[in-house]
């Protein structure tokens, strides 16, 4: 142990510490004790990206505020970029029996920063997350969604019927939160109010629970930040905007259910909806081919 401690003392100057803010980058140098370095070198490490993503995903699903990943990589790796890339891979991991992963996870966390320690291809990344929902709130949402779907009685229906009933339920039961403070399915279900993010994330959760492939799309609509959904029917993907189908303002019938933005292509009705860049890539478009025409039920 003494020999190892002496070796650690000799290499202390080679250990770099930095802070990665995921909206930017800030590098700082820190002094670490020999005990810090010794502990760092004796940690258990994941050996590949799949293990990294699984560790990060497991912690996020448990709504852990602090998640530490120990990763054995190479000297040439850009770990600041990888820390971001691994987070994106978590959001792209969608297991059918876990309806609160993937997009639900992405749209119910608020922000993240990360600390990075590196030493000759060995890395320790510590993420610090702020979530919009607690684990208890997410679990409550899951129970409520199951109860609502049971009431809608759509288990043995076709996907079109499932999508329409979920859309109509959300439009009927929710009011738009003009105070822009309620962005989660939990807040939507407990207060009856939500922003577009709350509408889209609740629709996503219900569609996933019902077995209908669905994504949340972030971007702008009429020049303002916005979120909506796409769903897969008969092999193609269609837009759904529950928020814009929910009438607001004076003199409107709040109980009237519209379908002006229901199962639409990117043409006509959705020309004012502009996706964020990551939803416009050729890779995304190939994976989620959009219909050229609005959906018409046979």
Where are these regions (language model features)?
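Periplasmic OmpA-like peptidoglycan-binding domain that tethers envelope proteins to the cell wall
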Residues: 188-197
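N-terminal accessory/pre-domain segments preceding catalytic cores
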Residues: 4-157, 268-298
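Secondary-structure boundary elements
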Residues: 134-188
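Hydrophobic/aromatic-rich core segments of domains that either
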Residues: 198-268
